[in-house]
Amino acid sequence: MRYFRLCIISLLATLPLRVHAGPQPLEQIKLSESQLSGSVGMIEMDLARPGTLTAWRADERFPMMSTFKVVLCGAGLARVDAGDEQLERKIHYRRQDLVDYSPVSEKHLADGMTVGELCAAAITMSDNSAANLLLPAVGGPAGLTAFLRQIGDNVTRLDRWETELNEALPGDARDTTTARSMAATLRKLLTSQRLSARSQRQLLQWMVDDRVAGRLIRSVLPAGWFIADKTGAGERGARGIVALLGPNNKAERIVVIYLRDTPASMAERNQQIAGIAGALIEHWQR
């Protein structure tokens, strides 16, 4: 008997220790909704294959906020592929064309910016005027919505310009998407023949170069992991992020997280999104 017990003890000693595993992703989302007193819409999808890995309120509408800028630049790149646009085309504008939060475009009133530079500013710095300057080429909000319909997204819609599109009124369908629709659209833009391989690489690189997302998913990303993302922020507690991430510096999954109708501060919203992402990553690694 003593020998048997020693064998069991020796066997247990060789097993890996389970260290205080965090909550499962859906448990974390429920906790976040409780702490935020608001709603979370979320989906996790494989980038290469159809199917949903994790979802919560994935078919409910949430304000898009600045996450629409990825789709906007995707539509612009589709025009480049078709020969109707050039990333090198210079756009000139006046001070009265600027809206709130234009950290890049406000510095180029004298010389203007190219389409490529405006997309970089819109995605990497979330420059609002850059987005507005790009919208006319795709037909404005209605034209961008038409582009979405053409690529099979029958849900996502843009109705207004920056900065009015961030109003996020409860129950207002304007300027909204669902986590599922946004994730599917991202997959189409980055993996299907909707864009050329060159344009796909460019769109992804702009997202890799995002400089205003450090307090969200990037704050919990393990060393050596890949991430490309775009954030959004709006009124009435609206906050969101669309991202591609994966281990070994490879994009493997799409993660979309939206918040709405919460009195939480921006710091609290960022923390909750980071917490949800952290739970997803931990579950992924198990």
From Swiss-Prot:
The keyword Lipoprotein does not apply. It catalyses: a beta-lactam + H2O = a substituted beta-amino acid. Gene3D superfamilies: DD-peptidase/beta-lactamase superfamily. The active site is at 66 (acyl-ester intermediate), 164 (proton acceptor). The keyword Signal applies. Disulfide bonds join 73-119. One of its GO terms (biological process) is response to antibiotic. Its EC number is 3.5.2.6. Pfam families: Beta-lactamase2. InterPro entries: Beta-lactam/transpept-like, Beta-lactam_cat, Beta-lactam_class-A, Beta-lactam_class-A_AS. Residues 1-21 form the signal peptide. It is an enzyme of class 3 (hydrolase). Keywords: Antibiotic resistance, Disulfide bond, Hydrolase, Plasmid, Signal. Belongs to the class-A beta-lactamase family. The class A beta-lactamase family has a specific amino-acid numbering system, sometimes called Ambler or ABL numbering and often misspelt as Amber. A multiple sequence alignment was used to derive a consensus sequence and then the consensus was numbered taking into account insertions and deletions. This allows use of identical numbers, e.g. for active site residues, despite differences in protein length. UniProt always uses natural numbering of residues, hence there appear to be differences in numbering between this entry and some papers. This is Beta-lactamase Ohio-1. It comes from Enterobacter cloacae.
